[in-house]
Amino acid sequence: FHIGGDEANLDLYKNVPEINSFMKKNNLGKDVNELFRYFLVRMNEIVKKHNKKMFLWEGFRREGEIEIPRDVVVFAFETMYHLPSHLIEDGFTVVNTSWTPLYLVNGGVKQPRARRAVWSPQTIYSWNVWRWEHWWDQTPVYKNPMQLEETSQIIGGQMCSWEQAGEAEIPSLRKRLPVFIERVWNNKEKMPFEDFFVRVEKNDLKLSKIIND
């Protein structure tokens, strides 16, 4: 069960009488971040009752009175709320969804700076599942990408494609996704990119026949 924690605009709840009453009743203090943590814990309890696992798209701070359960899987992408290194130190299971180079945003974006979020297959090939980067200069990993040591707590990666027309998905992913898959599933051995991309091109010809392109 997926929760997009980064989309929670907690400022909207600071001066809501009903929210303030609820926080007082449940001894949550005055910090709405504690309300958010309370919500995440409650959701995790509900999800587990249905024999499911909760996936959390980061969004919660490292500091807080209410402890976030360690059986929650955290998808870490922005390196803003809770650094991947801290998530590992704190015992969480993590999926690498690093903005650079795993995002593919190719048109229709209201935020102009995010239009940079399209990286070449070669750039994706230089990434590994223990590495986080970001194109935004306000993030901690902008100048110094975070390369973590190999750990079983990082269980994989995810390529993220959004804010583009449906017919644009296959053209933008067809030569990037195979490279990403190679770096996730075959991270122990690495041939030169030029040699590997020959395989991608051959398989892409087969894809063209399948989809009649």
Regions found by a protein language model. Give the residues of each.
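Active-site neighborhood of glycoside hydrolase catalytic domains
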Residues: F1-V72, F77-G91
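Flexible, acidic glycine-rich loops studded with aromatic residues
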Residues: K53-G59, I66-D213
